[in-house]
């Protein structure tokens, strides 16, 4: 995907009850099944937010997650 295709995506975080950790993600606004999670999990929600934001920024620059 080109960076322009990520203009209609958003970032967010989700909490895993089983591990008590957070993960960041980016998701297509129009196709909810099109979602990329951060590889790393985080104990702190703020760290997951930063990771998700960085992932979306990189995708918009033409470097989408694998």
Predicted regions: what is each one?
Residues 2-6, 29, 61:
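Contiguous segments within soluble domain cores/interaction surfaces
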Residues 31-47:
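A short, exposed loop/beta-hairpin motif centered on an aromatic-Gly-Thr core
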Residues 19-21, 25-36:
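Acidic, low-complexity, intrinsically disordered interaction modules
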Residues 1-23:
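Short N-terminal "domain-start" leader segments
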Residues 53-66:
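Short arginine-rich
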């Amino acid at each position: 995907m080109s960076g322009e295709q990520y203009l209609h995506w958003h970032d967010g975080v989700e909490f895993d009850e089983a591990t008590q950790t957070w993960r960041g993600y980016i998701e297509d606004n129009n196709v909810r099944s099109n979602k990329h999670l951060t590889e790393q999990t985080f104990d702190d929600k703020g760290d997951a937010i930063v990771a998700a934001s960085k992932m979306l920024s990189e995708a918009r620059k033409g470097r989408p997650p694998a």
